[in-house]
């Protein structure tokens, strides 16, 4: 469960290491984001020669949360940390690699590219 001011790890090779959520997209009263939701983030920690710089603002999709996601069969998939993948204005991933597992909930038309790049889909 991600809200404004939440810090997330970055699960791609854009050069960003940590981002902070500045807005949950999808309605003016929307407070929380879960796996598969798009958020607006700012880069807080970046690698020296990365594609992105500290202070820049991007869209991102949440790929892992410590809160987890409940499946239809009653199982719960959760992770040790919160992570996101940075997106451009067209909601396409900026990076060319994804690190760590992602969930099946991302298998929508919008995020199939992320699922195909991920090393493991849970």
From Swiss-Prot:
It comes from the Bacteria. GO terms for biological process: translation. GO terms for cellular component: cytosolic large ribosomal subunit. SUPFAM superfamilies: Ribosomal protein L14. One of its GO terms (molecular function) is structural constituent of ribosome. PROSITE patterns: RIBOSOMAL_L14 (PS00049). InterPro entries: Ribosomal_uL14 (IPR000218), Ribosomal_uL14_bac-type (IPR005745), Ribosomal_uL14_CS (IPR019972), Ribosomal_uL14_sf (IPR036853). Keywords: Ribonucleoprotein, Ribosomal protein, RNA-binding, rRNA-binding. The keyword rRNA-binding applies. Belongs to the universal ribosomal protein uL14 family. NCBIfam families: rplN_bact. This is Large ribosomal subunit protein uL14. It comes from Herminiimonas arsenicoxydans. The lineage of its organism: Bacteria, Pseudomonadati, Pseudomonadota, Betaproteobacteria, Burkholderiales. The gene is rplN.
